[in-house]
Amino acid sequence: MKLNELYNNIGAKKNKKRIARGIGSGKGKTGGRGIKGQKSRSGVAIKGFEGGQTPIIKRLPKRGFNCISTKKYNIINIYNIEEALADGRLSADDNITKEKLVEARVVNNKNNKKLVKLLSICSDDFAAPLSLKLDAYSSKAKDLIEKAGGKLL
């Protein structure tokens, strides 16, 4: 047996019905599209049209809204600040502000439009006494910084 001698068993694979190949084929002339009209033309798909029944987009109610006063935060963790201190990108002696975090590449903050919030995920201890001036802090992050002798400005 060779690769070029392989074939499917008879009846294992049925040929697809080829439409619009003459009236003797059983699916000829209009090819199952009916006569004239928008749906008989090529490239048509009426988006959202469900044949006259009320479309789902109209059946379902409007829900929710976009609050314009929602505050969007850049989230950073205490370990991000620890890494920047270890690398020398931040100094423990300075007041750590949003601008210094952007300079140290801890926060990616284009035009300083977003607020910065400090979390304490994966951090149970924090040694350096830092003075931070950020927009928001989680309660656990506040406790860790104050326990280490730091200040929140």
Swiss-Prot record:
One of its GO terms (cellular component) is large ribosomal subunit. Keywords: Ribonucleoprotein, Ribosomal protein, RNA-binding, rRNA-binding. GO terms for molecular function: rRNA binding; structural constituent of ribosome. Gene3D superfamilies: 3.100.10.10. InterPro entries: Ribosomal_uL15, Ribosomal_uL15/eL18, Ribosomal_uL15/eL18_sf, Ribosomal_uL15_bac-type. Residues 23-35 have a biased composition (Gly residues). GO terms for biological process: translation. It comes from the Bacteria. Residues 21-41 are annotated as: Disordered. The keyword Nucleotide-binding does not apply. HAMAP family: Ribosomal_uL15. PANTHER family: 50S RIBOSOMAL PROTEIN L15, LARGE RIBOSOMAL SUBUNIT PROTEIN UL15M. Part of the 50S ribosomal subunit. Binds to the 23S rRNA. Belongs to the universal ribosomal protein uL15 family. This is Large ribosomal subunit protein uL15. The gene is rplO.
